[in-house]
Amino acid sequence: MEIKAADIVLCEFYFSDLKTSKNRPVLVFKDNLPFDDFVGIPISSQIIHLHADEALIESTDFSEGLLPKSSKLMLRKPFIVSKKVVIKKYGTLSSGSFDRYQQLFCDYFQCCE
């Protein structure tokens, strides 16, 4: 499956026992890493408490597709994901929305110029 930055995908993550797993949506933040990896930002549907380092994902943020539930990005938790654990693609954020989330990420980690 072809994935690129701004895609939102469903991934299977194993717990430390390597026997049980959970499927989680992830924003593909940077996709041109070696070894078929990408930098992902986790997504949660637990939107009751929205922290300063989290951002709501609205249906209007998508250029195609959407998530099944209202959700938020957890910007403080970027991590490396193997493309081998991607189950399916939910959709793609519009370029304007993806740019906004990149800016929020950089603001949080103070990596802006």
Positions of PLM-derived features:
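Compact nucleic-acid interaction/catalytic patches
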Residues: 19-23, 28-63
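C-terminal terminal-subdomain/extension
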Residues: 62-113
